Amino acid sequence: TGDTGLASQPFVAISKQARASVVNISSVRKHTRKSIGPDPFFEDPLFRRFFGEEFERRTPGPRDYREQGLGSGVIVGSDGYIVTNNHVVDGMDEVTVSLPDKRTFKAKIIGTDPKTDVAVIKIDASDLPVLPWGDASQLQVGEMVLAVGNPFGLSQTVTMGIISAVGRANVGIVDYEDFIQTDAAINPGNSG
């Protein structure tokens, strides 16, 4: 281990505890795009003159697509309950959870709330490490905070910042607003 001084030791300990309870969530939505007929671009006289009449005129048929999503979640029940953001799992056909120990599980969506952007999912596992909830009413502007997640699918990433504001409202994100604002780096895939 590196010796960066005593000041960093609490952050190392907190990071270890938090990372054990933060999971990577991969989601898939399957859909079929219907045929839309021939593309008018290929029927353009200039295009036909350049490529010739023998250019194959195809009518695209239905195609299957897989839309993939990434996010993070926090284990809140040792029996497999995980809290994430609603937008991570909303409308998805498959949700897969990867634990820090590299085990993967198919997850079941238990409940979602689009207004607060919160969702609960469950995996079939037991004896999982649980991250305890804090008391947001005790937070103060200027306190240091850590954010743990899977930005861009890079698992177990920890960033640090301070609490910039508490009780933030009127930002137009969701109907219910009482946000904690931080300057800790939050990237796509950290949601959850």
Named regions from a protein language model:
Residues 1-192:
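Serine-dependent protease modules
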